[in-house]
Every structure is written in structure tokens, then in C-alpha cells.
């Protein structure tokens, strides 16, 4: 099974990043084995985070989200790289 990239958009509940950073500091990312963190970007208002994750088992995302859903609302989108998108669309050009 191939690994899939996921763009996870985290919306901090009540626009408050403090509990999220506190939990991450105290307990780490809480990602199950098989779910890999790639990188993340946080908006300058500390209201949301754009996080790139990778796994071959999308159920692991649900397991990970369960650790955070009390303080974060999630959007999860499967994504591909720009290079892969170009490769896939080129036959239609």
C-alpha cells in the first residue's frame, strides 16, 4: 500500500492556541506509529495550523485526531505534490 500525503487544517477552538501548544509540549504530537509528521505552518494570528502528514493507513488520522478534538477542529484533505499534479494532468493538456 502506498503512503498518502494529507493536509490537515487545525482550527484552534475559541481561537486559542495555548492549550494545543501546552499539550504538545507535555505529551508530544500523540501520533500513532505509522502516521508521520512532515511539517507545519501556523497563521500569524495563532488561530489555525496547516500540517502535512503521511500514512498508508488513513484510520491512523482518526486515532490521532481523537487525542486533540477537545481543543482543535480538523479538516483533512488528501493531497499530492505539484510535481505529481503536473504529471497526472499533462495527458489532458
Predicted features, each with a name:
Residues 65:
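Short, flexible helix/strand-to-coil boundary loops that buttress conserved ligand/catalytic motifs
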Residues 71-82:
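Conserved short beta-strand edge segments in small beta-sheet-based binding/regulatory domains
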Residues 51:
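Extracellular/luminal beta-rich ligand-recognition
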Residues 1-38, 42-48, 56-60, 81-93:
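Short S/T/G/P-rich N-terminal loop/turn motif that feeds into the first structured element of a domain
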Amino acid at each position: 500500500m502506498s503512503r498518502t500525503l494529507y493536509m490537515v487544517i487545525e482550527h484552534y477552538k475559541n481561537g486559542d492556541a495555548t492549550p494545543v501548544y501546552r499539550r504538545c509540549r507535555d505529551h508530544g504530537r500523540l501520533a500513532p506509529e505509522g502516521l508521520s509528521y512532515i511539517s507545519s505552518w501556523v497563521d500569524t494570528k495563532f488561530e489555525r495550523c496547516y500540517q502535512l502528514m503521511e500514512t498508508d493507513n488513513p484510520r491512523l488520522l482518526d486515532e490521532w485526531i481523537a487525542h486533540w478534538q477537545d481543543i482543535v477542529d480538523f479538516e483533512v484533505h488528501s493531497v499530492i505534490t505539484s510535481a505529481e499534479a503536473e504529471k497526472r494532468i499533462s495527458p489532458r493538456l
